[in-house]
């Protein structure tokens, strides 16, 4: 499963505790416009390996997280900014890059379009071709950790994911190997493990980490990415496994409601008893009752 997410260099919590008696002094921060707050986009990939049925539990792992960036050609020499005594910013510090140098910039995610040297893009096709597909091949191929498993790839219907060239490539690649490419239905983030659980968890931890390290200030794009990568690395696999089981059970609710998502507004909309029925392991979840669930086709 894969998806994209923006991480911001500053996130203010409306209900953060501000109690002077406890040593938590009220502080304020204002930005003239949201565009003044740095951000970077990441693309994350998770996986869940199981036998016969997700209801049997399984092993989850992180395939990777990638910053949406590409090389750009510098059009002029750039120096570091130096704050002057009167508070003004003057670009008179050491040389950062010279005209003609290549440097990495954050950019938009596309399906196949690499953009230009002046306006580069981050194409998903290249990421799948050079990294994701080879990594999955190593996992499920001969001698791999999950030899014999059949990969099923799921993404949403965002613009880059629906790019004709990208879809043609990934569907053809999967078809040639007996794999499956199964995009989720539109407007159903509750069926995507990343939107459902992983990204909300990461977002909260990212904000806490940034606040602990840098205080109440806007982080640079590099600092924002470093924090996102750190949060990703400490994300526990069993939490991802739990999210896969949760999404599977939510899908059953969607089917029972004939596609209607009104149940999500109820108090127990996304609560499906995962903690009740499963216990966590180091890298996944197992059933508490020890039962083995047959494949759906044989049930």
Where are the regions that the model predicts?
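Extended, low-complexity cationic-aromatic segments
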Residues: 1-135, 270-271, 275-277
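Generic structural signal for small/hydrophobic residues in well-ordered secondary structure
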Residues: 3, 44-46, 128, 132, ...
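Short, solvent-exposed loop/turn segments at secondary-structure junctions
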Residues: 5-9, 47-52, 158-161, 167, ...
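C-terminal anion-handling pockets and recognition modules
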Residues: 194-299
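Short, aromatic/basic amphipathic alpha-helical patches
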Residues: 164-175
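Intrinsically disordered, low-complexity regulatory regions enriched in Ser/Pro/Gly/Thr
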Residues: 34-38, 144-147, 173
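Short helix/loop segment immediately N-terminal to the Walker
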Residues: 137-149, 212-220
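Acidic/histidine-rich, metal-coordinating catalytic segments
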Residues: 2-4, 128-131, 142-162, 182-193
């Amino acid at each position: 499963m894969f998806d994209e997410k923006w991480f911001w260099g500053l996130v203010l919590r409306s209900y953060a505790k501000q109690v002077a008696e406890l040593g938590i002094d009220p502080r304020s921060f204002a930005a003239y416009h949201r565009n003044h707050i740095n951000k970077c986009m990441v693309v994350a990939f998770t996986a869940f390996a199981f036998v016969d049925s997700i209801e049997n539990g399984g092993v989850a792992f992180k395939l990777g997280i990638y910053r949406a960036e590409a090389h750009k050609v510098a059009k002029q020499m750039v120096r570091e900014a130096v704050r002057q005594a009167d508070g003004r910013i003057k670009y008179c510090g050491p040389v950062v890059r010279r005209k003609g140098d290549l440097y990495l910039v954050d950019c938009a995610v596309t399906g196949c379009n690499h953009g230009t040297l002046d306006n580069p893009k981050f194409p998903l096709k290249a990421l799948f071709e050079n990294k994701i597909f080879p990594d999955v091949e190593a996992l499920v191929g001969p001698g791999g950790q999950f030899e014999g498993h059949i990969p099923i790839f799921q993404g949403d219907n965002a613009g880059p994911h629906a790019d004709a060239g990208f879809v043609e490539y990934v569907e053809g690649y999967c078809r040639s190997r007996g794999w499956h490419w199964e995009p989720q239905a539109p407007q159903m983030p509750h069926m995507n493990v990343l939107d459902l659980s992983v990204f909300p968890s990461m977002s909260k931890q990212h904000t806490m980490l940034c606040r602990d390290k840098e205080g109440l200030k806007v982080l640079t794009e590099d600092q924002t990415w470093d924090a996102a990568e750190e949060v990703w690395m400490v994300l526990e696999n069993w939490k991802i496994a739990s999210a896969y089981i949760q999404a599977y059970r939510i899908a059953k609710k969607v089917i029972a409601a004939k596609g209607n998502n009104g149940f999500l507004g109820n108090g127990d909309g996304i609560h499906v008893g995962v903690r009740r029925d499963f216990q966590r392991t180091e890298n996944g979840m197992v059933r508490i009752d020890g039962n083995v669930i047959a494949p759906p086709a044989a049930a």
